[in-house]
Each structure stands twice: as C-alpha cells, then as structure tokens.
C-alpha cells in the first residue's frame, strides 16, 4: 500500500522541479508510517530535478528558512513540522518568501 498526496511549489520555488508547480505523488509507505521528514527525503530524491538545487530547498537537514510550509493550508509549525504523520489526501505547499530585487 502507498500514500497518495499532493506537493506544490509556489513563489518561484517550482524552479527546482523543472517549473512544475503541482505534483501528485504516491509515496511508498503504509498509512501512519511516513512523516514530513520522510517526505523531505522523497522530494530531494524524486522531485528535485538537479542535485545542485537541493540547497535551494534544504538546509541543515530540513526545509531552509524563507520557505513557508503549509500542510492542508495550515502552517506546519502548528502541525508538528517534520514529525507530522502523513495521511492520504494531504496537500503540502512549499512557498518561497524570498525575492530578489
């Protein structure tokens, strides 16, 4: 069995995934086993198209500062951050809040 979720990259962050904003993913975990930490690993291995772009998304093993993370439209800090247990149907939105100028 696997978990079906949606991952979105907004605010220019889609550049790390060949300019694809929305990804429907089937992650190879049983319901109740996978956490956001597992999802971050999945994203770095399966969605980020160029390994050189991983530092754009990850810093010190987690999502880098300046990226807003929402789980089902709720700030991930309210949901337990990396420890949140993923459920089928969840939507994860990663939005860059940093802009050049």
Curated annotation (Swiss-Prot):
Cellular localisation: Cytoplasm
Pathway the protein contributes to: tRNA modification; 5-methoxycarbonylmethyl-2-thiouridine-tRNA biosynthesis
Major localization class: cytoplasm
Disulphide bond pairs: none
A GO biological-process term: protein urmylation
Molecular function (Gene Ontology), one example: protein homodimerization activity
Crosslink site: Glycyl lysine isopeptide (Gly-Lys) (interchain with K-? in acceptor proteins): 101
Post-translational modification: C-terminal thiocarboxylation occurs in 2 steps, it is first acyl-adenylated (-COAMP) via the hesA/moeB/thiF part of UBA4, then thiocarboxylated (-COSH) via the rhodanese domain of UBA4.
Pfam family, one: Urm1
Listed GO CC annotations: cytosol; nucleus
Positions of modified residues (1-thioglycine): 101
Function: Acts as a sulfur carrier required for 2-thiolation of mcm(5)S(2)U at tRNA wobble positions of cytosolic tRNA(Lys), tRNA(Glu) and tRNA(Gln). Serves as sulfur donor in tRNA 2-thiolation reaction by being thiocarboxylated (-COSH) at its C-terminus by the MOCS3 homolog UBA4. The sulfur is then transferred to tRNA to form 2-thiolation of mcm(5)S(2)U. Prior mcm(5) tRNA modification by the elongator complex is required for 2-thiolation. Also acts as a ubiquitin-like protein (UBL) that is covalently conjugated via an isopeptide bond to lysine residues of target proteins such as AHP1.
UniProt cross-references to PANTHER family, sorted A to Z: RURM1 PROTEIN
Family statement drawn from the similarity comment of this UniProt entry: Belongs to the URM1 family.
Protein name: Ubiquitin-related modifier 1
Gene name for this UniProt entry: URM1
């Amino acid at each position: 069995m696997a978990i079906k979720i949606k991952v979105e990259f907004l605010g220019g962050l889609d550049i790390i995934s060949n300019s694809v904003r929305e990804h429907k993913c089937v992650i190879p975990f049983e319901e109740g086993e996978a956490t956001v930490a597992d999802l971050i690993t999945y994203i770095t291995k399966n969605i980020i198209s160029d390994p050189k772009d991983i530092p754009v998304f990850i810093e010190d093993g987690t999502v880098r500062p300046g990226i807003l993370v929402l789980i089902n439209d709720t700030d991930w800090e309210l949901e337990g951050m990396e420890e949140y247990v993923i459920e089928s149907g969840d939507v994860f939105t990663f939005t860059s809040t940093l802009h050049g100028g």
